[in-house]
UniProtKB/Swiss-Prot annotation:
Swiss-Prot/TrEMBL GO biological process terms: viral RNA genome replication; viral translational frameshifting
Protein name: Protein PA-X
Site residues (Important for efficient shutoff activity and nuclear localization), renumbered to this chain: 195, 198-199
Encoding gene (name): PA
Protein's UniProt keywords contain Endoplasmic reticulum: no
Superkingdom classification of source: Viruses
Taxonomic classification: Viruses, Riboviria, Orthornavirae, Negarnaviricota, Polyploviricotina
Record organism: Influenza A virus (strain A/Puerto Rico/8/1934 H1N1)
Compartment list: Host cytoplasm; Host nucleus
Active-site residues annotated for this sequence: 80, 108
UniProt family annotation: Belongs to the influenza viruses PA-X family.
GO terms assigned for molecular function: RNA binding
Amino acid sequence: MEDFVRQCFNPMIVELAEKTMKEYGEDLKIETNKFAAICTHLEVCFMYSDFHFINEQGESIIVELGDPNALLKHRFEIIEGRDRTMAWTVVNSICNTTGAEKPKFLPDLYDYKENRFIEIGVTRREVHIYYLEKANKIKSEKTHIHIFSFTGEEMATKADYTLDEESRARIKTRLFTIRQEMASRGLWDSFVSPREEKRQLKKGLKSQEQCASLPTKVSRRTSPALKILEPMWMDSNRTATLRASCLKCPKK
């Protein structure tokens, strides 16, 4: 699974996922399914905000990469992918600027057009079940919830899907592609089944114990994408870099 993730996701997304797991004390070498899930969620959040801007009239417009209208305001603020301290700093800044109610839990995005925080969900299960779990956890009508599945289904608060149909179709197509690529490599069943995931986790722990005494080689390589991203992370105009087109899965 780890090899699949590194082949099928943008290096920037992979490194952000690595940092997230490290922050929470999780080992991506063992919890490979979680590694894949985090990368998938990050990519969906980035795709959700791709190309969406607000013009001078306050209207939401779609601008493709390379368009000269660089001074347009980005419609979405990406919160997901930041370390917790920085993420809460961004949330507090948004609340102070817009008057939005501070959420109890860290959301994934902020929509400047609709003036609301957004929680993005990507599920391997039924969308309505995952939606209810999210709603019960958040317990706030102020945070908008939007759930996507790997089967092309989606569910959103009050059936308000925020994005246009084409933008949502891009996300659904990407998720379906990830599912197909996992299935072709025999990875989908373990990814979708908690029982199989636990079995793989135990197997990984046992394997790690056996290999603990072996010499290891640590890679110090940093992807060019992340080198560009890091100094721009606090810049409100960093989106062109952040929204770098995601790598497609190579054929088996």
